[in-house]
UniProtKB/Swiss-Prot annotation:
It comes from Chlamydia muridarum (strain MoPn / Nigg). ATP-dependent specificity component of the Clp protease. It directs the protease to specific substrates. Can perform chaperone functions in the absence of ClpP. PROSITE patterns: CLPX_ZB. GO terms for molecular function: ATP binding; ATP hydrolysis activity; ATP-dependent protein folding chaperone; protein dimerization activity; unfolded protein binding; zinc ion binding. This is ATP-dependent Clp protease ATP-binding subunit ClpX. InterPro entries: AAA+_ATPase, ATP-dep_Clp_protease_ClpX, ATPase_AAA_core, Clp_ATPase_C, Clp_protease_ATP-bd_su_ClpX, ClpX_bact, P-loop_NTPase, Znf_CppX_C4. GO terms for cellular component: HslUV protease complex.
Length: 419
């Protein structure tokens, strides 16, 4: 008579007669003793699912700086000139966003909606600077992405989830910090749907990208490849919950004012004087932007619906450009003045010269961005010569230096001072 072979636990080696229960699997067995042992280990070690949930819950446990809207705006004022309406609106939106995170941290029953921000306005009006300044004030990780480089999954280009990777890198791979950071996506208007019937051709960098951005902007757990690039099987991922990340997107939205003017023209019959005035005033028109205008421009309704704060950054005036040159904490004239002071040379800008620089920047139609280029071109040769010339005491930039390309006025030191 053949003796029956006893089944044994594949983990501890106990036979079926030495244990109370032995559970069979494909070619393996596990006893009740080992099950209890493994259960105890799992109770002490968070599972991947638990870690995924806990990241968003534990993120706010680190110090969270929540300033009042007035405090936020006051800090922005130190770096950003003009844009009073935009700064007030964004200050409130950011305050509510981080108040929402704090409410989640305190397990409050009432939850607040997410305060993502859409900034409209011409190039050089301060959209990016506002976002950068916010991140600096709040001491949170910050990254900038260019919407024109993004493509939907399956096409050559950059996956939208790589934006989250950049934020994670800015946070030194601290997931908890990254999950309450700020992402600014520039040139968002460039992914507007360009045709009314998108089924004719595949819009790789338009509607498809808007669809791809929807989930991470609204809030999802994104699987991020640590080294970026495309995803592939058997790859390790870092899970980042985007629910508490503040998304700010910006774009020039060229000709959006015409779409708004057309709508106002249809709805303000009998008020032609007011309408005609608005048509000639782009900033006033953009201040009246509605969701339907952005949809007509080419943004899909689902995407626009993710932004409950839409605000216009107005084109900078001549006086504001001059103020940008001299007033902010990091004003560019202050920077160059300090550079020359390190060479023991005094750099002087006459008021008329500052206005001439501002006028030149305005003509370039790139707003404040042109100011730095104008000054760099103006002072480059001087910065090359001055370190080797101890005879120069001061340099004066006059209006003619800008308008007629005349050389700056250079004042020499006295021989006694050089000696």
């Amino acid at each position: 008579m053949t003796k029956k072979n006893l089944a044994i636990c594949s983990f501890c080696g106990r036979s079926e007669k030495d244990v109370e229960k032995l559970i069979a699997g494909p070619s393996v067995y596990i006893c009740d003793y080992c099950i209890k042992l493994c259960s105890g280990i799992l109770d002490k070690t968070p599972t991947p699912a638990a870690q995924e949930v806990s990241t968003s819950q534990t993120a706010p446990q680190t110090s969270l700086k929540v300033l009042t809207p007035k405090e936020i705006k006051r800090h922005i004022d130190s770096y950003v000139v003009g844009q009073e309406r935009a700064k007030k609106t964004i200050s409130v939106a950011v305050y509510n966003h981080y108040k929402r995170i704090r409410a989640l941290m305190q397990d409050k029953q009432v939850s607040y909606g997410k305060s993502n921000v859409l900034l409209l306005g011409p190039t050089g009006s301060g959209k990016t600077l506002i976002a950068k300044t916010l991140a600096k004030i709040l001491d949170v990780p910050f990254t900038i992405a260019d919407a024109t480089t993004l493509t939907e999954a399956g096409y050559v280009g950059e996956d939208v989830e790589n934006i989250v990777l950049r934020l994670l890198q800015a946070a030194d791979y601290d997931v908890a910090r990254a999950e309450r950071g700020i992402i600014y996506i520039d040139e968002i208007d460039k992914i507007g749907r360009t045709t009314a019937n998108v089924s004719i051709t595949r819009d790789v960098s338009g509607e498809g990208v808007q669809q791809a951005l929807l989930k991470i902007i609204e809030g999802t757990v994104a699987n991020i490849p640590p080294k970026g690039g495309r995803k592939h099987p058997n790859q390790e991922y870092i899970r980042v919950n985007t629910e508490n990340i503040l998304f700010i997107v910006g774009g020039a939205f060229v000709n959006l004012d015409k779409i708004i003017a057309k709508r106002l023209g249809r709805t303000t019959i009998g008020f032609s004087e007011e309408t005609d005035l608005a048509v000639t005033d782009r900033d006033r028109l953009l201040a009246k932007v509605e969701t339907e205008d952005l949809i007509a421009f080419g943004m899909i309704p689902e995407f626009i619906g993710r932004f409950n704060c839409i605000v216009n950054c107005e084109e900078l005036t001549l006086d504001e450009l001059v103020e940008i040159l001299t007033e902010p904490a990091n004003a560019i004239v202050k920077q160059y003045t300090e550079l020359f002071a390190e060479e023991n040379v005094k750099l002087i800008f006459e008021k008329e010269a500052l206005y001439a620089i501002a006028q030149k920047a305005k003509q370039a139609k790139t707003g404040a961005r042109a100011l730095g280029m104008i000054l760099e071109n103006l002072l480059r040769d001087l910065m090359f010569e001055i370190p080797s010339d101890p005879t120069v005491e001061s340099i004066r930039i006059e209006e003619d230096t800008i308008t007629q390309n005349k050389s700056p006025v250079i004042i020499q030191r006295s021989p006694e001072a050089i000696a």
